[in-house]
């Protein structure tokens, strides 16, 4: 009974992990001010002009309450 020789082990390319978080340009629904916020924010981000809450933390990704204009990164 002959066994086949073991196949050579192929190494996979090491993938560089990339962050899933992004910076977002968000427009305030109340006054229209545009502001950059973090997508995984751990605190409430308020509009610098009117004080309206733009981002609420949820324990992971933050809930974005304004309109997302652009995604950076």
Curated annotation (Swiss-Prot):
Q: Where are the zinc fingers (C4-type)?
A: 28-50
| Record SUPFAM superfamilies | Zn-binding ribosomal proteins
Q: Name one GO cellular component term.
A: ribosome
Any one GO biological process: translation
The protein's name: Small ribosomal subunit protein eS27
**Family, per the entry?**
Belongs to the eukaryotic ribosomal protein eS27 family.
The coding gene here is rps27e
Assembly state and interactors? Part of the 30S ribosomal subunit.
Coiled-coil intervals in this record?
Answer: none
**Cofactor(s) recorded in Swiss-Prot or TrEMBL:** Zn(2+)
NCBIfam families associated with the record: PRK00415.1
Q: What would you give as a GO molecular function for this chain, any one? A: structural constituent of ribosome
Q: InterPro entries annotated for this entry?
A: Ribosomal_eS27, Ribosomal_eS27_Zn-bd_dom_sf, Ribosomal_zn-bd
Q: How is the cofactor bound?
A: Binds 1 zinc ion per subunit.
Q: Detail which positions bind Zn(2+).
A: 28, 31, 47, 50
Instruction: Give the disulfide map.
Output: none
Q: What are the protein's UniProt keywords?
A: Metal-binding, Ribonucleoprotein, Ribosomal protein, Zinc, Zinc-finger
